[in-house]
């Protein structure tokens, strides 16, 4: 073995140089770090600390570690990932505003309250997590007075075989989804689920973190926009099949469209006396107002039919609306991917389907061959004209065939 360098006093030893007991401790520390990442929903945003340059390296760029974090670089790493993931899109933060190590430590402890690792191993892990996060407690300046991790209940309701999961508040989302996919990874899946078992996983997105309000509003808006565009295009297709083409716009109904404008908080006043649905400008105006309506009523659905009639007579606008619907569909699929946090576990299958209640259903294909008819329904929860939540309802079914049954059932042993 080569002689240690002058900087080896501060460098971490190689894993192979440690005793079996020490290696076990290192593995526990790695599990704790993984629990930290899971608690913060970091998706693919991971980083590494470069001690030579005192920087944190990410896929978007490097950040110099402040002097206050010199003895607690784990805190700095977690904070950088946390800030990047708080943005709508992962990118480099040019002027990153650092907070004190004590504030980062408090934030982490609050997030760990519901992590499944500490629900199961909290007693053995507490000292390790303190040392991992901050080897020098005096750096915390006594700003974090609650020294005990409060363990919350971790409950999953099971009703076998009709419904397996009925989950959950958003604070438990990471644990619940991890448990769900871990269950599907069992080598002997048929021992847990009988054939044709229905599995349902309901996820509420309310109360996740500081920026969840914008996430709920953005997701509900995408659902609404896709639903409206799809309804208009479907009605246009219907009219082209039932009415001689080219079709001229519908008769004027000022009262109908006045109601739409009254329901919206934005938009300039419109002279409805001169209004005609076959006007391109009025078509655009009605579309803009309609997409701002939070809860669609029967009157709004009638307006959608009028817009569909106009689209049926304008191939150019129909093409533009079709492309816009495709972009919304892609956004919905990416939203599902981000919520499930299991890249590579599934692929898009049959696209998106609109339901009568204003929600949409995204069809996916899980990598587990014994699971069929898998889809996720995205349903906005509206109260008093405001979006309060978005429910993600995953549904799938266990279907054993001769081909995949051998993959899930244990092989019979022969003496």
Swiss-Prot record:
One of its GO terms (biological process) is plasmid partitioning. Pfam families: Rep_4 (PF05797). It comes from the Eukaryota. Keywords: Plasmid, Plasmid partition. InterPro entries: Rep_fungi (IPR008897). Plasmid partition require REP1, REP2, and a cis-acting DNA sequence (known as STB). REP1 may act by intercalating in the yeast nuclear matrix and binding STB either directly or via REP2. This is Trans-acting factor B. It comes from Kluyveromyces lactis (Yeast). The lineage of its organism: Eukaryota, Fungi, Dikarya, Ascomycota, Saccharomycotina. The gene is B.
């Amino acid at each position: 073995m080569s002689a240690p360098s002058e900087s080896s006093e501060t460098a971490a030893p190689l894993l192979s140089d440690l005793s079996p007991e020490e290696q076990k401790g290192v593995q526990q520390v790695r599990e704790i770090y993984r629990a930290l990442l899971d608690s913060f929903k970091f998706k693919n945003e991971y980083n590494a600390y470069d001690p030579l340059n005192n920087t944190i390296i990410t896929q978007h760029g490097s950040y110099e570690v402040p002097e206050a974090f010199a003895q607690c670089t784990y805190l700095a790493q977690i904070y950088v990932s946390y800030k990047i993931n708080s943005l709508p899109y992962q990118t480099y933060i040019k002027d990153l505003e650092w907070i004190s190590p004590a504030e980062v430590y408090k934030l982490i402890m609050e997030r760990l309250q519901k992590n499944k690792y500490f629900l199961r191993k909290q007693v053995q892990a507490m000292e390790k997590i303190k040392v991992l996060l901050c080897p020098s407690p005096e750096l915390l300046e006594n700003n974090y007075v609650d020294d005990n991790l409060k363990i919350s209940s971790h409950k999953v309701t099971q009703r076998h075989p009709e419904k397996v999961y009925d989950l959950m508040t958003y604070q438990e989302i990471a644990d619940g989804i991890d448990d769900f996919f871990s269950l599907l990874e069992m080598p002997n899946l048929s021992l847990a689920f009988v054939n044709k078992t229905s599995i349902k996983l309901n996820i509420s997105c309310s109360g996740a973190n500081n920026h969840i309000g914008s996430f709920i509003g953005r997701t509900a808006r995408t659902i609404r926009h896709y639903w409206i565009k799809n309804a208009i295009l479907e009605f246009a297709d219907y009219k082209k099949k039932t009415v001689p083409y080219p079709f001229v716009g519908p008769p004027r109904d000022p009262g109908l469209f006045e109601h739409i404008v009254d329901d919206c908080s934005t938009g300039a006043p419109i002279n409805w006396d001169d209004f005609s649905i076959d006007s391109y400008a009025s078509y655009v105006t009605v579309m803009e107002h309609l997409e701002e309506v939070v809860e669609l009523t029967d009157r709004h659905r009638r307006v959608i039919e009028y817009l569909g009639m106009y689209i049926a007579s304008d191939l150019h606008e129909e093409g533009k609306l079709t492309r816009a619907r495709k972009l919304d569909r892609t956004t919905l699929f990416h939203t599902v991917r981000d919520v499930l946090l299991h890249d590579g576990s599934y692929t898009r299958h049959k696209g998106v389907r609109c339901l009568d209640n204003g929600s949409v259903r995204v069809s996916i294909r899980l990598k587990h061959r014994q699971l069929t008819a898998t889809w996720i329904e995205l349903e906005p929860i509206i109260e008093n004209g405001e979006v309060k939540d978005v429910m993600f309802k995953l549904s799938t079914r266990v279907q054993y065939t001769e081909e995949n049954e051998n993959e899930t059932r244990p092989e019979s042993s022969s003496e």
